[in-house]
Amino acid sequence: MYQSLLKSLNRLNPRAWDFIQLTRMDKPIGIYLLLWPTLWALWIAGKGSPSLANIVIFVLGVVLTRAGGCVINDWADRKVDGHVKRTAQRPIAAGKISSKEALVFFALLMGVSFLLVLCTNAATIWLSLGGLALAFTYPFMKRYTYYPQVVLGAAFSWGMPMAFTAETGELPATAWLLWIANLLWTVGYDTYYAMTDRDDDLKIGVKSTAILFGDADRVIILTLQVLSLGCLVLAGSKFELGMWFHLGLLVAAGCYAWEFWYTRDRDRMRCFRAFLHNHWAGLAIFVGIVLDYALR
């Protein structure tokens, strides 16, 4: 139904589907993976009752910034995507959208996102500039370092300190524990994603943690996930979160264990499904946080 709704936009403009594919709006997994940790932070900062205005601002901000990140990523990879089977038909690589159109669209998405941030406060506005820098920098990292997933993790976690400053006007040191936890989690699940392209990336010289980790990939991913949970346990104790929060972490741990088992043969599609599966871990943690505050 969701896909049909998006495709119906072609009736308004025959090129609408090209821009939907460019922003990955037809593949909302990236929205979920960015949204859940942002909401973790927003709920904790608001002690279970964040302002409705901030909820709207951050949900819309997640959708827009993720879309913008996809656009700038495809623009940066426009000469590479055509050599990778999975990405060869992306709109810029396939010539459906020009480089100039992509840059203008990216600027438009970031401009609207910034207008949302202007509805918060000075501290959040300043922090948003760091998020913009990370979003623009990430796509180029895979050319120079084996750690582009770390930059992605920093970018995908940047909404968390922003949530604290928007909701409270302050940024407690403990909030950075949440940031670190999400960074570790992101590096883990994006390594699963990178494992699906590892063979192609080796041929064209693109770097990733999947290549760096080699045969130790799954063990390192699981280690990162366990460390992420450890950071969340520490943060939970500082923020006085209780049983429901820890039950959410337990469900997430179960998700990670299943992913480790499921990818035992490193089949491409299994690695991709493991990447997608991380959305449920993020949701479980969010539900745990919500229930922990709601049932006090």
Swiss-Prot record:
Keyword Magnesium recorded: yes
Give TM segment ranges.
28-48, 52-72, 102-122, 146-166, 169-189, 219-239, 241-261, 275-295
What is the E.C. number? 2.5.1.39
Q: Name one GO cellular component term.
A: plasma membrane
Q: Which Gene3D superfamilies match?
A: UbiA prenyltransferase (1.20.120.1780)
PANTHER family for the chain: 4-HYDROXYBENZOATE POLYPRENYLTRANSFERASE, MITOCHONDRIAL, PRENYLTRANSFERASES
Family statement: Belongs to the UbiA prenyltransferase family.
Return the protein name. 4-hydroxybenzoate octaprenyltransferase
Q: What is the lineage of its organism?
A: Bacteria, Pseudomonadati, Pseudomonadota, Gammaproteobacteria, Pseudomonadales
